[in-house]
Amino acid sequence: MGSSGLLSLLVLFVLLANVQGPGLTDWLFPRRCPKIREECEFQERDVCTKDRQCQDNKKCCVFSCGKKCLDLKQDVCEMPKETGPCLAYFLHWWYDKKDNTCSMFVYGGCQGNNNNFQSKANCLNTCKNKRFP
């Protein structure tokens, strides 16, 4: 197959990606887990150990002091504050995009979302230097 054959194949993949949606492009160009250094006061319980344990094509990534299912198309720093339905009392931090700062909140200990950090330093390290439109 010459260079024109490869070019035709590439054009076909691009067209299929536009028609089929993100599934094909994710297969061709998989997204990677974020690499963020964090200092953890304690190791959190892992939600997953492998990608197949995550729903909705999320990836199992080391994030915020434990393994969690992340939607790599969604920025955790843009998620709202969620305390979760449980009644524990953990002082955690979340990133408020509107104010461009990390604020303390009471996390109930379960569920919620991934905009949830053990320390202000971890929150700032993950979210502060991002450029938002």
Swiss-Prot record:
Residues 117-133 are annotated as: Interaction with LTF. The keyword Secreted applies. In testis, expressed and secreted by Sertoli cells, appearing on the surface of testicular and ejaculate spermatozoa. Expressed in the spermatogonia and the earliest preleptotene spermatocytes. In the epididymis, is expressed and secreted by epithelial cells and covers the surface of epididymal spermatozoa and ciliated epithelial cells (at protein level). Expressed specifically in epididymis and testis. Isoform 2 is expressed only in the epididymis. Weak expression is detected in myoid cells as well as spermatogenic cells. It comes from the Eukaryota. Residues 77-127 form the BPTI/Kunitz inhibitor domain. Monomer. Homodimer. Homomultimers. Interacts with SEMG1 (via 164-283 AA). Interacts with LTF. Found in a complex with LTF, CLU, EPPIN and SEMG1. Keywords: Antimicrobial, Disulfide bond, Protease inhibitor, Secreted, Serine protease inhibitor, Signal. PANTHER family: EPPIN (PTHR46751:SF2). It comes from Homo sapiens. Changing residue 102 to A: Reduces the binding to SEMG1 by 45%. The keyword Disulfide bond applies. GO terms for biological process: defense response to bacterium; negative regulation of calcium ion import; negative regulation of flagellated sperm motility; negative regulation of peptidase activity. This is Eppin. Residues 26-73 form the WAP domain. Gene3D superfamilies: Elafin-like, Pancreatic trypsin inhibitor Kunitz domain. Disulfide bonds join 33-61, 40-65, 48-60, 54-69, 77-127, 86-110, 102-123. The gene is EPPIN. Coiled coil: none annotated. GO terms for molecular function: serine-type endopeptidase inhibitor activity. Residues 102-133 are annotated as: Interaction with SEMG1. Serine protease inhibitor that plays an essential role in male reproduction and fertility. Modulates the hydrolysis of SEMG1 by KLK3/PSA (a serine protease), provides antimicrobial protection for spermatozoa in the ejaculate coagulum, and binds SEMG1 thereby inhibiting sperm motility.
